[in-house]
Amino acid sequence: MATQARPKREIRTPLSRERVLRAAIELADEGGIESLSMRRLAQDLGVEAMSLYYYFARKDDLTDGMLDAVFGEMELPASTPDWRADVRRCAISAKEVLLRHAWATKLVGNGRTFPSQARLVWMNAILGRLRSAGFSPNMTHHAYHALDSHIVGFVLWVLPYLAISKAQPDLTARFLEDFPYAELPHLAEHIREHAEERPGDTSEFEFGLELILDGLERLRASAA
């Protein structure tokens, strides 16, 4: 008599803190931080919402963990003879990470929590690279904030443009149809320059970054 084969049980990936964080980041990347809820996250993971609270007692704890994971993606500075190249790579890496996770900048700027461990490590590494390049403590302080403001400021400035260009690719053309060229010729020229840029073009970021690095190098050299 043939024995009936038992149906194979579905093998689920065990729930873990790392798995919850990855799923939460993917959800926020896709729909923004506003789309994140414990209920929706549990649904995506195929678990009960209450099981998430074993890893994160509050939603704020979850978003703190997400921010920590995001800052952990940022490149730390090397220690080559070229301090500018080392800092440049880190700044570009930080910008790319924040653009990849557009929701993160909102959380960084809300002032709700102390910076995460990964962010503190990144800050310490940048400060240390500036000090090892010969900057005084005071100049390192100002240099770090100039770089940080440029990174975060650029991301905050460019994200709405990326969203608009994706949702309404012909918006600039329609805007320029009725633009008062005679009254505002310089602004019209400026808008045309923007219109010619490719979505996601980062030359603006790198232009400003080079100005900052050039200025810092002059200050460093004059203080030597």
Model-found features: residue ranges?
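Helix-turn-helix
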Residues: 19, 23, 27-61, 65
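Amphipathic alpha-helical segments used for helix-helix packing
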Residues: 67, 95-115, 125, 156-160, ...
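C-terminal all-alpha effector/ligand-binding and dimerization domain
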Residues: 197, 201-217
